[in-house]
Amino acid sequence: MQAALLRLASTEELLAPDENGVRLPAGFHSRIVVRSGQILFNYQWHAAPDGGAIFATEDAGWIYVSNSELDHNAGGVGALRFDHSGKLIDAYSILNNTNRNCAGGHTPWQTWLSCEEIAKGRVWECDPFGKKEGQVRAALGLFRHEAVAVDTINKQIYLTEDETDGCLYRY
């Protein structure tokens, strides 16, 4: 895995688009895992996918979480669970009834912070394993959130604001 990431980070020339329209370096391939509206494991994958992250599982698999940037309380966060071989084994929601969930951030304590990109938008802390309901983190403010990053060394949280004259906030 480390070698593949190092190759991906190199400055290799990208090849012509593959069958999925993705340009990749030599030795890499793409696959479409899911499309918006597709039903997987009794869960309909959301429209307007946006910010996401990967979380390791105890059995060497992983969970991919993805925000849904829809308005009118139709936004939220979906999760795809993969086994150690990369086979998709589950799909489920970890947050519903929110608005324009844009980017967010992976926390060191293994949760996903999903940011609403609306006036008076909130930050929701979500459990990627789907065992706990999402919680509003009111202390992170009400504004048009974009993304969040956690600095564990200096014990700081950084938030960006999605405005033309937006700010970078440090907590």
Residue ranges, per PLM feature:
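Sequence/structural signature of beta-propeller domains
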Residues: 1-171
